[in-house]
Amino acid sequence: MITLDLTLPDCRYPIHIGQGVLDRAGELVAPHLPQSRALIVTNDVVAPLYLERCRQSLQAAGVCTEVVILPDGEAHKDWQTLNCIFDALIAMRAERKTALVALGGGVIGDMTGFAAACWQRGAPFVQIPTTLLAQVDSSVGGKTAINHPAGKNMIGAFWQPRVVLADLDVLDTLPEREFSAGLAEVYKYGLIDNLPFFEWCEQQVPALLARDKAALAHAVEVSCRMKAAIVGQDEKEQGVRALLNLGHTFGHAIEAGLGFGVWLHGEAVAAGMVLAAETAQEMGQLESADVLRIRALLLQSNLPVVPPAWPLATWLELMGHDKKVEGGQLRFVLPDRLGHCRLESGVGEKYLEKVLIHNIRD
């Protein structure tokens, strides 16, 4: 097992990565809880696979647990489903020190964290991510939210977990499409600030797709280490943390425009990263050969590289709800070379139109 620490001015918490971590949930989680009571929040896909193992481990460590099982999918990341968590907390007479344990992917983690941030103005919570995307990205860093019909993650809070458990073994049951979606977020780290890691990913696609445990351990560790370092510098996304949104301005627009859940988050980010790279190319910041390498890596990993065919006005309306908008102006994370990105304001519509029309014609 590998243990990383994320250190912030007001808190510090461990990220445990390895095989068999879920069965050690009790010993790894209990020391971080202020009270020996917890609500496990999971979904109807994960529950039959991992709920009892998680619950038994926590109870063996003296943590009394209740459970709420939510419907699976991005389409349920809303107020109605969030209220199911609050109803369960009320039914169990939860207190401010009662912990919430997120057992699931990014949707479960985001909603559980937001519920914890809201419950009696702040309750402890734990992340036990069961998807690759959640293990390498959404479970680390304290971003919590639900969606609004107008946009992705529009309603939320920064609320850090007490501990994160990333069990590589649970990835064995992940559907291929969801596994590939997680790889998009892995590759993102190489693109924003780690060229050697990007090159390693290019070489390791077969091993990653085969879910080789050594390759997965390295991918998850590097991703979490990079995210922990960035969040440690900029918890509330006032500066460098914005770089983690590479591909997300386009990607969130795709998710909202198609309807949440039609494309997986990682699929939308993959297409968004290609659009960001092609925008940078049009602006003269990125070589065409680098764009081709990005596209090739994503295609090898069974990820989409062509966005929906929408008019520019539709894109601009959808992207106008992006959380990086400042002073009414869109801001994009764009690569200027492989392994390096920067935040750009004032990207001309002529570049966006050319890139989007180019993709539509493809």
From Swiss-Prot:
It catalyses: 7-phospho-2-dehydro-3-deoxy-D-arabino-heptonate = 3-dehydroquinate + phosphate. It is found in: Cytoplasm. Pfam families: DHQ_synthase (PF01761), DHQS_C (PF24621). Keywords: Amino-acid biosynthesis, Aromatic amino acid biosynthesis, Cobalt, Cytoplasm, Lyase, Metal-binding, NAD, Nucleotide-binding, Zinc. It comes from the Bacteria. Zn(2+) binds at residues 185, 248, 265. Its EC number is 4.2.3.4. Pathway: Metabolic intermediate biosynthesis; chorismate biosynthesis; chorismate from D-erythrose 4-phosphate and phosphoenolpyruvate: step 2/7. The keyword Zinc applies. InterPro entries: Dehydroquinate_synthase, DHQ_synth_AroB, DHQ_synth_fam, DHQS/DOIS_N, DHQS_C. Binds 1 divalent metal cation per subunit. Can use either Co(2+) or Zn(2+). Catalyzes the conversion of 3-deoxy-D-arabino-heptulosonate 7-phosphate (DAHP) to dehydroquinate (DHQ). This is 3-dehydroquinate synthase.
